[in-house]
Amino acid sequence: MQEKILVTGGAGFIGTHTVIELIQAGHQVVVVDNLVNSNRKSLEVVERITGVEVPFYEVDIRDTDTLRDIFKQEEPTGVIHFAGLKAVGESTRIPLAYYDNNIAGTVSLLKAMEENNCKNIIFSSSATVYGDPQTVPILEDFPLSVTNPYGRTKLMLEEILTDIYKADSEWNVVLLRYFNPIGAHESGDLGENPNGIPNNLLPYVTQVAVGKLEQVQVFGDDYDTEDGTGVRDYIHVVDLAKGHVAALKKIQKGSGLNVYNLGTGKGYSVLEIIQNMEKAVGRPIPYRIVDRRPGDIASCYSDPAKAKAELGWEAELDITQMCEDAWRWQSKHPNGFED
């Protein structure tokens, strides 16, 4: 059955890749994005790759009145909610902006959904809700705690969505806790395109490799890990996007409230990522060790077994593919979508 899905933040990195997978799975898609950390041209690439025109509304989801009108006009059956600010370090400097964007924006979205009787939502949560885990790999039933305002917004939103479901069992909610999405579309024409200096490791590394930035800053080499640098579970953005399509199948069956980790189950350190990117690029990538960032933790990787058992989903693309695809995108488009 073809569903119409409204995707907030659908012009962003994960959003665009998910829109492609949704269209290829036979769904209609409507995108809402304020373009604060994304680019309208990314959706033109999506349309070129899929051959399908994607209705787009340049709207901030805090604008509830406009959202209501969009829901009335488009009548989506479900929402995949990506929109929000997403940088750990930045969130410690400007927490109020994170609470305003992420919390107020989502409450506004949920009001518009409820008023239009659209009660199916897949929420883009994060592994940051686990805080600094006692052990790894991380299971969905681990205790939740957060070490920074970004993570706190994700945890608060999980709680808000849980409360809504408890109050009204007509809601179907899937909380997807992502680990660290990297890579790019295999075409090399769609990838991570941050506005300004990247906050995330991979686009920073690729921008150094392409000569836009001088060297990679490695935040701390004194963590309790094999080489002293932070370990994360990096997942190919296309695998992550496919996880949303799998979650949508689950939600269509009147599933209630469900939580899944979306990761590979394997951790790589910052230095290992740089080494893998050097192989993809074919030359050394300069880096220097600097102080730790506030809010960062030593090691974080998933146990994705629940998603495999219940959604029939697992990550398929390895770290080599992630780095090669990220480099193909960056080398073809050194200035992102402006090229």
What spans do the regions from the language model cover?
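N-terminal Rossmann-like NAD(P)+-binding domain of SDR-like oxidoreductases, especially those catalyzing
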Residues: 1-184
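Short, electropositive, low-hydrophobicity segments enriched in small/polar residues
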Residues: 13-19, 42, 88, 109, ...
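Secondary-structure transition/hinge residues
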Residues: 75, 117, 165, 169, ...
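Short-chain dehydrogenase/reductase
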Residues: 99, 147-155, 191-199, 203, ...
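C-terminal substrate-binding subdomain of Rossmann-fold SDR/epimerase-dehydratase oxidoreductases
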Residues: 202-339
